[in-house]
Amino acid sequence: MFARNHRQKHQREWILWGLPIGMVAIAGLLIASTQRQADYADWYHHWITAGVGVVVALILERLPLQRLKPFLLPIFGLTVASLVAVRLIGTTALGAQRWISIGGIHVQPSEFAKIAAILLLAAVLSKHPVERPVDVLRPLGVISIPWLLVFIQPDLGTSLVFGALMLTMLYWSGMPIEWVTLLLSPLVTALFAGIFPWAMVIWIPLMALLAYRSLPWKRIASTITIAIHGAMAIVTPWLWMHGLKDYQRDRLVLFLDPSQDPLGGGYHLLQSTVGIGSGGLFGAGLLQGQLTKLRFIPEQHTDFIFSALGEETGFIGCLLVVLGFALLMARLLQVARHARSDFESLVVIGIGTMLMFQVVVNIFMTIGLGPVTGIPLPFLSYGRSAMVVNFISLGLCLSVVRQSRRSFAGLR
């Protein structure tokens, strides 16, 4: 029985290795297809970067996460300093200042800040779980620093990732779902203020009722909730005009109707959906997509790699990739549930949230169900910093698997 259980655990670990490496291999071919008419070798760099990432993951797999705890604040401080450096000496591209050039290689600190934030947030929540409303100030303080520095780059997509992983980790640590909903609700109010103003007549009283029923000092809590949402509704138009860059506003507007500017801001969305639709059931074949080969979609090898997948492998290929990500998330949930400590469990759930949020947002973007955000598709999109961070994440999760297995063996 023990031998069979051991074999099953060993086989499950191949989910965390096999799926990402398989996606990287396919992505190299897709990237090569997007650049066949140009003298680029990004497909080669994609595989080389993944190879470096695998080595890093193998090292981290053998390092117990508990040993990282003394270094979490310095790591977090270093990533924050790098985000500040982006503002001072960063490289600007495509209208945003997000990179630092080191030896001719562009490094994107915001990618590494995700991992640093997850690790420190996990340490804070495992030591100080949110049992009172005031306790939420600690995790908010941790996440707000990198969030703000990333938002002003500007990088709206990555800033959303920070918010998603914080809310999920708060819930996983034991925070009531009602409190999580109240934290998220001002963002919903902002969306309603811009799109469906009449919905606030129902939404704001509903949130006030939720605050009254779930928070201490019920009347004060509900009054403060109404004030916060009312202020958000008033401030949203100003934020729309002055808080977002012109191209960010265009992306949000054109998401609703790309045909308003088919040769400008809506071009990416329209061509992406055409490419995916042209793939049909089985696709044109790897390296055979006409829209992909002719480079109808600029920068397709980065944020829009899923459209190349759709054109060349069809619905079946897209479905297999989506199922692969679902299987990866299911395995991460299993690892988080069986982790030895709350800290390790929170790290895994934060990493899972980071990866799956990016998957959902990127795929929705490429099929026309979401605005263009600049969020890459994990293990598939070209991007050196993102690829290394993906494998760092994988290595941390594998470390939890390894330590859990050792604990299980010790109990035997």
Regions found by a protein language model. Give the residues of each.
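Transmembrane helix boundary and interhelical junction motifs in multipass membrane proteins
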Residues: 155-160, 283-289, 300-302, 369, ...
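Helix-boundary and loop/linker segments of multi-pass membrane transporters
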Residues: 8-9, 135-136, 294-297, 339-340
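Short, Lys/Arg-rich, polar N-terminal cytosolic tail immediately upstream
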Residues: 1-10
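TM-adjacent membrane-interface loops and short helices in multi-pass inner/ER membrane proteins
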Residues: 254-302, 313-317
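Hydrophobic alpha-helical transmembrane segments
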Residues: 126, 269-278, 390-397
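A juxtamembrane structural motif centered on a specific transmembrane helix
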Residues: 1, 362-412
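Hydrophobic alpha-helical transmembrane segments of multi-pass inner membrane proteins, especially
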Residues: 16-264, 311-368, 392-396, 412
